[in-house]
Regions:
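Preference for protein termini
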Residues: 1-355
Length: 355
């Protein structure tokens, strides 16, 4: 597989030719950049991959039950497995989603779980990313271009094909579809992952729509064609954050949402993929309790461990953090994707005392 390295420049030229881009905002200015390709592969054996798959499925299963529980019965809080302040105080907890249960009870249709392999060669989970995970299209495209640039590499090695993600996503949409077409909903071309939105719409055979293409009537969601004809929508793979999904329910100033889409969702007339309110499970305070969650809901030992984590809510953890802060990475519980990260080794003594 290391034969791919000599094709790095060629693959990057192909990525540029096909316009594989992602966007970033810096100083309130939107810039598009070509997706950077690293030809050095991370080789994972089938046995190791099967182990990871089992662990990830177990974790997502427990998190899915947790999401239904906290928005309905709240049994995990009543049984004092998780302190209520970590649920209700989480930035991602949405009171507007109380009592709302999605079709087939599936909250987390897609997850973007971050893994890291330690010096001990064990795999650890860093983040769960159940809100609006992104990035699946880039390895699919990279694999396609790698095969094109170096077909002999793939003939000589048995490599599992990852290009079936579009089929898997379509199957997930079909499974929860309440009757109607599937839609990929994008906020527009200035979103950082707009390329991916259009790519996944093509690969799933779903209608690629913007918010102005959709409307709700009688608690049913419809897609309006240019001809004026309308089609009922049964499932929406939405790439719009919760706060902006519905100006009638969440942020009233949102220009990206579909008015009353939450009414259609609450009535069980449309599936939203992923379910609104999932971001509570991405909170770093909740992350701390996922191993306990797995034991509580599934009666199983966690297959994959969290990265060693200390929560200053507990006196013992607080003492450890204060004694070892310069060896630790400090994260804001409400942040994700590298935001709000502080490296203890880079802190001045004054900043340590401030924290």
């Amino acid at each position: 597989m290391y034969g791919l390295i000599e094709h790095t420049d060629e693959i990057n030229r192909l990525l540029a030719r096909y316009g594989v881009k992602f966007g970033i905002y810096k100083n309130n200015v939107f810039n598009e950049r070509l997706f950077p390709f690293d030809a050095v592969p991370r080789i994972i054996s089938k046995d190791e991959f099967d182990y990871l798959e089992r662990g990830l499925k177990q974790r997502v299963k427990a998190l899915n039950i947790f999401l239904k529980d906290i928005y309905t019965k709240k049994q995990i809080i009543k049984d004092k497995i998780i302190p209520e302040e970590f649920v209700y105080g989480a930035a991602g907890y949405m009171m507007e989603c109380e009592g709302a249960v999605p079709p087939k009870d599936v909250f987390a249709h897609i997850s973007g779980i971050d893994l890291v392999q330690g010096n001990d060669m064990r795999w650890y989970v860093l983040e769960d990313n159940l809100r609006v995970p992104s990035g699946a299209s880039y390895p699919m495209i990279a694999r396609e271009l790698c095969r094109r640039a170096s077909p002999d590499t793939f003939r000589a090695n048995t490599v599992v094909d990852n290009r079936n993600y579009g089929d898997l996503l379509r199957n997930a949409l079909d499974y929860v579809n309440t009757g109607g077409i599937n839609v990929v909903l994008t906020p527009g071309r200035f979103n950082s992952a707009f390329f991916e939105h259009s790519y996944l719409a093509e690969k799933t055979g779903a209608v690629f729509a913007m918010p102005q293409d959709l409307f709700v009537e009688g608690n049913v969601l419809y897609y309006s064609e240019y001809s004026g004809k309308r089609q009922r929508v049964g499932a929406v793979y939405r790439r719009i954050n919760d706060d902006f999904m519905d100006p009638m329910t969440f942020r009233a100033d949102s220009l990206l949402g579909v008015p009353h889409i939450m009414d259609a969702y609450r009535a069980g007339n449309v599936a939203l993929v992923n379910a609104p309110g999932n971001s509570v499970a991405d909170d770093k305070g909740i992350y701390y309790y996922v191993p306990a969650m797995i034991k509580y809901y599934l009666g199983e030992e966690p297959i994959l461990s969290n990265a060693p984590t200390y929560l200053p809510f507990y006196e013992e953890d607080m003492k450890y953090v204060l004694d070892n802060i310069q060896k630790l990475v400090i994260k804001d519980v409400a942040e994700s994707g590298g935001y709000g990260v502080v490296f203890g080794s880079e802190l001045s003594l004054e900043r340590v005392y401030e924290l």
